[in-house]
From Swiss-Prot:
Matching HAMAP family: Rel_fac_1
Modified residues (N5-methylglutamine): 236
PROSITE patterns for the chain: RF_PROK_I (PS00745)
GO function terms (MF aspect): translation release factor activity, codon specific
Entries under SUPFAM superfamilies matching the protein: Release factor
UniProt main location, coarse: cytoplasm
Protein family per UniProt: Belongs to the prokaryotic/mitochondrial release factor family.
GO CC aspect terms: cytoplasm
Protein biosynthesis keyword on record: yes
Name listed for the protein in its UniProt record: Peptide chain release factor 1
Length: 357
């Protein structure tokens, strides 16, 4: 851990500065700035706490060794403290491993139906509900930005904004960033009269939505803005005016829709926020080979062959093919009980980061 000393010193100094800023009433006059400082403070607090425990244990070990030199009964305490220091040292190494800079961010999540027609659209709706239920379990805020429904009430596509309310170091992105990819379902469709199991798929795309996206330069001449009549639920009159907005970024082909705000101006403003977040994510992807490799796991086309996860209804089984995770509680997972799976994905990611340091 000697090589980490400079990093620790820098973090301790930053921690002290953040403490002072959080105690300053003027900071809290700017809610955005206060949230940013609070999130960074929450991110480094576990590092500082673990480091202080490690230093205290080292001091205790030195004292125990001196006592053990005169009294053999202290030998057990020396062994116990040695083990404790080893655990704390490994924990600190883990905490100092490179973190995803977006872990504290909120997200935009898109669900798209793929091959399978109505069954795929119904499954896409099941996935959207799963993420909504998961967000509710964590006290997060979910906003439906736009959706296109199928004849049977499924989703051809749906776009959700999911935001946390606190300053946790691990925000929505930290938990749901692994969800991007093709999700495959095996079940008897409601349209199947012979009781045969069919396979279809839906795709999920996840993008971080940072607090600050001002650095993204968007040229108005690169945009095509279409307005149309909202098809979703909204305020009074939403179905009688062309309030929904679709923005196409011509250079990249990115399309963003928003239809659930009360006015066309509000829908356009929200769509521009989502577009800025997507363009920022795209720029970061292009700038980083590692990020590009990670993003490659997210779908470009919804093809049943490039799956990350399978939902098998006859066996009540869910299988994540990236980490060989299997569980027979599909009904609970679809009701938002995702934490065991997401914990396993996060642990695999953490191990990979440690191996690359």
């Amino acid at each position: 851990m000697a090589e980490a000393a400079p990093a620790i010193e820098a973090i301790l100094a930053e921690y002290g500065e953040l403490e002072q800023r959080l105690a300053d009433p003027d900071l809290h006059a700017d809610a955005g700035a206060a949230r940013k400082v609070g999130r960074r403070f929450a991110q480094i607090s576990p590092i500082v706490a673990t480091y202080r425990k490690l230093e205290a244990a080292r001091g205790d070990l030195e004292a125990a060794r001196e006592l053990a030199a005169d009294d053999a009964s202290f030998a057990a305490e020396v062994d116990e403290l040695t083990d404790q220091i080893g655990d704390l040292d490994r924990a600190l190494t883990d905490l100092l491993a490179p973190r995803d800079p977006h872990d504290a961010d909120d997200i935009v999540l898109e669900v798209k139906s793929g091959e399978g027609g109505e069954e795929s659209a119904l499954f896409a709706a099941d996935l959207a509900r799963m993420y909504i239920r998961y967000a509710e379990r964590h006290g997060w805020t979910v906003t439906m930005l736009g959706e296109t429904t199928s004849d049977l009430g499924g989703y051809k596509d749906a776009t959700l904004s999911i935001a946390s309310k606190g300053d946790s170091a691990d925000g929505v992105w930290a938990r749901l960033k692994f969800e991007g990819g093709v999700h495959r379902v095996q079940r008897v469709p409601v349209t199947e009269s012979q009781g045969r199991v069919h396979t279809s798929a839906a795709g999920v795309l996840v993008y971080p939505e940072p607090d600050e996206v001002e650095q993204v330069q968007i040229d108005e001449s690169d945009l095509r803005v279409d307005v149309y009549r909202s098809s979703g639920k909204g305020g009074q009159g939403v179905n009688t005016t062309d309030s929904a907005v679709r923005i196409t970024h011509l250079p990249t082909g990115i399309v963003v829709t928003c239809q659930n705000e009360r006015s066309q101006l509000q829908n356009k403003a929200r769509a521009m926020q989502v577009l800025a977040a997507r363009l920022q994510a795209l720029a970061e992807e292009q700038a980083s080979a590692d990020a590009s490799a990670d993003r490659a796991s997210q779908i470009r086309t919804v093809d049943r062959s490039e799956r990350i996860r399978t939902y098998n209804f006859p066996e009540n089984r869910i299988a994540d093919h990236r980490i060989n995770f299997k569980a027979h509680n599909l009904d609970q997972v679809l009701d938002g009980d995702l934490d065991p799976l997401l914990d396993a994905l996060a642990a695999a990611d953490r191990q990979a980061r440690l191996q690359n340091t």
